[in-house]
Amino acid sequence: LNSSPTGDVSGERQTTSLFVELNAPITDSISTQLAVRHESSDDFASATVGKFAIGWEVNPSLSLRASASTAFRAPNIIQLNEGGVVRSGSNDDWVVQRVQDVLNEAGGYDGDTSITDSDIDSYYTIQRRAIGGNKLDAEESTNSSIGLVYTPEMVPGLMVTLDQWSIEKEKTIGLFGRENQIVNDMLLRFENGLNNCGSFIGDPLVVREAPDAGEAGYYTAAGICPIGVVKYVQNDYTNMATRNLAGTDIGVYYDIDTKFGDFGFKYIGSKTDEFTQDASGEFAFLQSQKEAGLIPANIPLDGFGDLLGMDGNYDTKHTVKASWRLGDWGATMSMLQKGEFYQNSLTLSDGTRYVIPEMTTIDATVSYSFRMNGNKARLRFAVKNLEDERAPLADRYYGYYADAHQDYGRNYYLDLRVTF
């Protein structure tokens, strides 16, 4: 209770913007588009972005398209004006975890050959405190894409799209993270050893309680000054490193009308080929320390490096939908598949990853349209997650990775919609 209080936030923003768009045909088969937008706000720097797009109708069946653009995202009202927000969550105390590992590698402590959380607890509730920052800059991105649209004349109703895209985003707004801050605290404490224990505080953003006298011996035996549990980690919003994403999207759309009804088919597939965040500043320092072997392999670094396939960032997503309509009746069936990824915090000391497998769900609906007191009405019955697929097991709240999956199981709803 009251472990994650959120205070009221107030703020205001006055924005002046200007937008200009020009569509300029070059030939009968080639057209271009040029757009420019400028925004000026009173609480962060102004920004000017633009877009250039070109399309070429090679023949009645094939069109090529490409675009390049810049974009920005202003810091939101909360990120600029947050007076203070606290979030509590269970986290690893990597200082304690490493102390356990060091003692166990040395044969234990005080006659105990296996030091665990029952001796000194390495996993408990830790608060994160954050405040807004009026020094935040807007996120900026450069985007490009190239693709094609294919509508074969010999198959009426069929359309295939294929696009390759890339995004480079700078000044991404985010948090350094509790985990990373505690890892930095661990580095500083093991580097300091047993020197000046009365005055040494480690990472000043990791605020700890006074050491427990009954546990002090574990830390001195491992070669560091005794510590208490983490009271809170100060983690304010900041503009972080450059983020790069790239991938390929494909779409297949097919509609056909028959005496048995109108049928539709849609497939959308997305393959992410790159998702990285450059290590800079504190991130770069931690990465260099890990590469030097000063941070063990079983201690994860969050939020930078190669993020593809990590912690909910699956690299494939497939959506399939089939629909039918005849008169007042209609039906649909759809499938959603999300690819596998690994949970970084469960990586073993030898580098073995815990892989969370892909998840596929199927939905189905039946609908009937009619008139109700002269108004258009529709009654729909739907079954979500037809096969009662459960979310794959993960070391998270409720046993699954909520950032990527839902675990509702099979569920139903009946919907009546009336248009007046």
Model-identified regions with their sequence ranges:
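Hydrophobic, lipid-facing positions within transmembrane beta-strands of outer-membrane proteins
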Residues: T16-L22, T48-I54, G132, T142-L148, ...
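Transmembrane beta-strands of outer-membrane beta-barrel pores
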Residues: T16, V36-D42, A68-A74, N81-G83, ...
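Outer-membrane beta-barrel transmembrane domain signature of Gram-negative proteins
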Residues: L1-S31, A279-N313, K317-T319
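C-terminal beta-signal and adjacent terminal beta-strands/loops
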Residues: E170, D273-T276, S280, S334-L346, ...
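Transmembrane beta-strands of outer-membrane beta-barrel proteins
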Residues: T32-L34, G50, L64-A66, I146, ...
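Outer-membrane beta-barrel signature, preferentially recognizing the C-terminal barrel domain
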Residues: G11, A74-V160, V233-G247, T258, ...
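Surface-exposed extracellular loop regions of Gram-negative outer-membrane beta-barrel proteins
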Residues: V9-E57, S141-S145, S334-L336
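Outer-membrane beta-barrel channels and translocator barrels
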Residues: T27-S29, E57-S61, S141, E153-V155, ...
